[in-house]
C-alpha cells in the first residue's frame, strides 16, 4: 500500500497536546511525515488540521488562516496562565456584573485591537519558549501585537460570585482567546480567565468535519475508507477549498512541470492553487508579480 497523503481534520481531545495528536496519527498512517497547522493548548478541544505526506506542504498556507472558537470566560478570578490550569493570583467578587455591563465591556474588543499575548505561551523570547521561561521563574513581558476580532458574540451569562460567560469569536491568526478573557476581566475590574475553549474552525475547515481520534484508531485497525483507513482530503480537494484557484492550460501545466516560469493569471494572491486540466494540484503559486513564482510543486509522477 502506498503511503497516505492529504489533509486530515481532527477533533483534538482535552488533555492532549497537538504533538500528541501528531504522534498518534503518525502511527496510524505509518509515516513520520505528519504535521499540524496551528497549536491548540492541552486544555482546548476542537479543530486541528493535519497534513500527511505531501499534505504537509500545504500547512504553510493554512497556519495564517482566521479561526473560530467557542469558549467560556470566568469573571472574578485571574490566573497566572490566563486559563483554568494556572494558579489563581487574584479573586474579586463579580456578583454585581450584569449582562449589559459585560456586553458594554466587550464592545472595544471587536475589530482591530492591540493584544499582549499570554505569557505562558509558545512564543519564543530570545530563542526560548515563553512558557519555559515562566516555569523557570522568569518575569516574561511579551510585546503587544495587532490582531482582529471580527466576531464576538455572547451566548450566555451565568451569574454568581464568579460569572461564567459563554462566547463565540472569529479571530485572526495569532489571537490568544486566553488573553481576551484576561483583558475582559481587567476591563471589568474583577479579573478573568478561560475555563473552556473549543476551536470550531480553521479557515474553511470546520468542527463538523473533524474526526474523533479514537474512532480513527478503530477505523484504521479495520482498514476503513481512505489510505490506511484514514479519511483524508486529497491534495486537490484541500487545495481547492483552502486557496484561490487557477486552472492551468495544458501548455502552462507542461511548463510548470518542467520547472519553467509562467505568467501570472487570475487571483493576484501570494498563494494560489494551480490545477492541471485534469484536476491535479500541480503547484501553489505566488501571483503578486507579472511572472508567477512557484512556492510548492506537487509533481504528477510522484502521485
Q: Model-derived features: where do they sit?
A:
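Accessory RNA 3′-end/elbow-binding domains used by RNA modification enzymes
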Residues: 1-13, 19-36, 40, 44, ...
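Catalytic cores of RNA-modifying enzymes
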Residues: 1-173, 177-209
Amino acid at each position: 500500500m502506498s503511503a497516505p497523503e492529504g489533509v486530515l481534520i481532527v477533533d483534538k481531545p482535552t488533555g492532549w497536546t497537538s504533538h500528541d495528536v501528531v504522534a498518534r496519527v503518525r502511527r496510524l498512517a505509518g509515516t513520520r511525515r505528519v504535521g499540524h497547522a496551528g497549536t491548540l493548548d492541552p486544555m482546548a478541544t476542537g479543530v486541528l488540521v493535519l497534513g500527511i505526506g505531501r499534505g504537509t506542504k500545504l500547512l504553510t498556507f493554512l497556519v495564517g488562516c482566521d479561526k473560530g472558537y467557542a469558549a467560556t470566560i470566568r469573571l472574578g478570578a485571574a490566573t497566572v496562565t490566563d486559563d483554568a490550569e494556572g494558579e489563581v493570583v487574584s479573586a474579586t467578587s463579580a456578583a454585581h456584573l450584569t449582562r449589559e455591563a459585560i456586553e458594554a465591556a466587550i464592545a472595544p474588543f471587536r475589530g482591530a485591537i492591540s493584544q499582549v499575548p499570554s505569557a505562558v505561551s509558545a512564543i519564543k523570547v530570545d530563542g526560548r519558549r515563553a512558557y519555559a521561561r515562566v516555569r523557570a521563574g522568569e518575569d516574561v513581558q511579551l510585546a503587544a501585537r495587532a490582531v482582529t476580532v471580527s466576531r464576538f458574540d455572547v451566548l450566555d451569562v451565568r451569574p454568581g460570585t464568579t460569572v461564567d460567560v459563554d462566547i463565540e469569536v472569529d479571530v485572526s491568526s495569532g489571537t490568544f482567546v486566553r488573553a481576551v478573557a484576561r483583558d475582559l476581566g481587567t476591563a471589568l475590574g474583577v479579573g478573568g480567565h478561560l475555563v473552556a475553549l473549543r476551536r470550531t474552525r480553521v479557515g474553511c475547515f470546520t468542527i463538523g468535519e473533524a474526526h474523533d481520534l479514537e474512532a480513527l484508531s478503530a477505523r484504521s485497525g479495520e482498514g476503513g475508507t481512505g489510505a490506511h483507513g484514514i479519511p483524508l482530503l486529497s491534495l486537490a480537494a484541500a487545495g481547492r477549498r483552502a486557496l484561490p484557484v487557477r486552472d492551468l492550460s495544458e501548455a502552462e501545466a507542461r511548463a510548470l512541470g518542467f520547472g519553467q516560469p509562467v505568467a501570472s493569471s487570475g487571483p493576484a494572491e501570494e498563494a494560489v492553487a494551480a490545477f492541471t486540466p485534469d484536476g491535479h494540484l500541480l503547484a501553489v503559486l505566488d501571483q503578486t508579480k507579472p511572472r508567477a513564482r512557484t512556492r510548492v510543486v506537487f509533481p504528477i509522477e510522484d502521485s
